[in-house]
Amino acid sequence: MSEMTPREIVSELDKHIIGQDAAKRSVAIALRNRWRRMQLNEELRHEVTPKNILMIGPTGVGKTEIARRLAKLANAPFIKVEATKFTEVGYVGKEVDSIIRDLTDSAIKMVRMQSIEKNRYRAEEMAEERILDVLIPPAKNNWGQPEQQQEPSAARQAFRKKLREGELDDKEIEINLAAAPMGVEIMAPPGMEEMTSQLQSMFQNLGGQKQKPRKLKIKDAMKLLVEEEAAKLVNPEELKEQAIEAVEQHGIVFIDEIDKICKRGNVSGPDVSREGVQRDLLPLVEGCTVSTKHGMVKTDHILFIASGAFQVASPSDLIPELQGRLPIRVELQALTAEDFERILTEPNASVTVQYKALMETEGVHIEFTDDGIKRIAQAAWQVNETTENIGARRLHTVLERLMEDISYDASDLGGQTITIDADYVSKHLDALVADEDLSRFIL
């Protein structure tokens, strides 16, 4: 679990997301409250439930990007799902309980990686011994079993020194490695994914753990042996317990496009992919127990963050019970031309930085001037105003159009420097931006 303070979390989000300070503050406080709760005594800790968040804002302003960055910062089980993929229980499609199952699977992977990393030093020693056994086979007794020696031989110590110094990295050896489990692909109808994964696990375990001889360079064999030995040191039962504990105490679920499951006014009959999904989400958000293949998982202290554009529907169109379980509302603002300028220059991996790096691979150096950046931002904002407002995603469309000729001819332009200024942008984009019909279909 992350121990970052809210200020540190916001500072980290600022490196990738421009504006939207209220949303950043809310998720930062929610993340910090996870840590604060764990510092309480057990009796009070059980009573403190997470304050779920509803993020409201037009498309392309940073809702999903906040979720992506939060997943990296949280250091906790995290899953992002689309609300539109689920249907009410009993109908064809995924049921909402699969959210918790997927969250538990991601926790198992996360805890396994942490456990492997914790045991890496010991695993490296064991892998080293296995390689030395191949290079200098131990002496055997009359029954064909390796003799137990009090101290390693001088030759073994000499090879160990060479191995650690990398002198033997390119030497090829034949070594027995665990064979890949038998692959079984089972196609199941929607909603039956849990049964499918259990059947696959059963078939994979039928053959037992087999070993297969492989010829590899020592440096490649060492990597595989370390992974294999580290996996042996992981206790599967402890792994499940720790993963379930991590999900129950620190799990975060991000539900995107929640506005798409709001009930439409004049719809009659069963609304299985809208209001039905909301009703199924209620017990998860309120707190219930979900059965997974790893064990029972309680959702009482899982943090839920929902987001939606709410351009057609409004938050009040959600069923009242679900509204009550999303007490913190955060409104994200539409982006201005000034925001677009900052998006093009400030983030660590801004779109302009990406295009520069891509062209550098062909030996072409791209320079964006300040007035060029400003003109690109104005063009994107203008198209958003005159057609559909898709937020910062419009920058990708505009830049792709702007860079099309350079990208096409890059292999013939090696060693050249191309400056993208206001005149260059105007020459390539003004006609498209001015014509609303063209910009609607091209930009």
From Swiss-Prot:
SMART domains for this protein: AAA, ClpB_D2-small
Gene Ontology MF terms: ATP binding; ATP hydrolysis activity; peptidase activity; proteasome-activating activity
Gene3D superfamilies hit by this protein: 1.10.8.60, DNA helicase RuvA subunit, C-terminal domain, P-loop containing nucleotide triphosphate hydrolases
Residues bound to ATP: I18, G60, V61, G62, K63, T64, E65, D256, E321, R393
Coiled-coil boundaries: none
Localization, UniProt: Cytoplasm
The family this protein is said to belong to: Belongs to the ClpX chaperone family. HslU subfamily.
Subunit comment: A double ring-shaped homohexamer of HslV is capped on each side by a ring-shaped HslU homohexamer. The assembly of the HslU/HslV complex is dependent on binding of ATP.
Name the record gives this protein: ATP-dependent protease ATPase subunit HslU
UniProt source species: Cronobacter sakazakii (strain ATCC BAA-894) (Enterobacter sakazakii)
Originating gene: hslU
